[in-house]
């Protein structure tokens, strides 16, 4: 057997195994026509509504009250906590939780996640970039001003599971469904709509993922689609 034929056979076997591993769960049937208030596109600010405001010392880019970037004209001797307090429009109920940092010859940054009353805000937080002298240069991310949101769910997790199963017409065993609880901001037409929501995730193939957000107070399915 030629080496090329052997290699082709091995490659074909690998591809077959990959396709098998990437197949979706046949026991899960999603209702593709489920009508929801939002889609995955509403989970990030739209670029058309980003506004930049430049002053003598910095440029702030925002979406409504949401800060997406703070860039200083020159490096400043400020801690991230000082910037959070002085530049970001968040109340005391919001906090920026340290996640990790890295400093080497090529980069110097620290990552923070946003929480509101102890509940993580979905995909919100920021990365702080410093020069090699630990002077702050810029902040990038997404910081949402969350206020007056009740973080105590009205409906239970088990009830949210029932809503999920009934709406998606799925054959889930409720004992094997797990949900996360998040503060979730949705962005639409320059406005922000913040909900306390349960999240369910289901992987589809190798790269796709279905995310379903269920309002933890009303039980409304806020969004359910493939991303």
Tell me what each language-model feature is.
Residues 3-9, 15-43:
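Bacterial Sec-dependent N-terminal signal peptides
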Residues 30-227:
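Segments that shape or occlude catalytic/ligand-binding pockets
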């Amino acid at each position: 057997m030629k080496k090329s034929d052997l290699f082709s056979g091995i490659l074909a076997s690998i591809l077959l195994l990959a396709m098998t591993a990437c197949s979706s769960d046949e026991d899960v049937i999603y209702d593709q026509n489920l009508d929801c208030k939002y889609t995955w596109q509403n989970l990030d600010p739209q670029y058309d509504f980003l506004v930049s405001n430049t002053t003598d010392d910095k440029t702030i880019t925002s979406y409504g009250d949401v800060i997406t970037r703070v860039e200083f004209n020159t490096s400043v001797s400020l801690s991230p906590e000082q910037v959070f307090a002085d530049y970001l429009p968040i109340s005391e109920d919001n906090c920026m939780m340290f996640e990790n940092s890295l400093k080497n010859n090529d980069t110097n940054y620290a990552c923070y996640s946003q929480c509101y009353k102890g509940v993580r805000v979905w995909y919100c937080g920021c990365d702080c970039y410093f020069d090699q002298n630990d002077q702050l240069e810029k902040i990038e991310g997404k910081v949402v001003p969350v206020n007056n949101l009740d973080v105590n769910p009205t409906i239970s997790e088990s009830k949210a599971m029932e809503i999920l199963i009934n709406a998606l017409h799925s054959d889930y065993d409720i004992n094997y469904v797990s949900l996360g609880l998040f503060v979730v901001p949705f962005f639409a037409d320059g406005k922000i709509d913040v909900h306390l929501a349960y999240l369910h995730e289901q992987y589809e193939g190798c790269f796709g993922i279905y995310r379903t957000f269920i309002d933890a107070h009303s039980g409304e399915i806020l969004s359910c689609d493939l991303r």
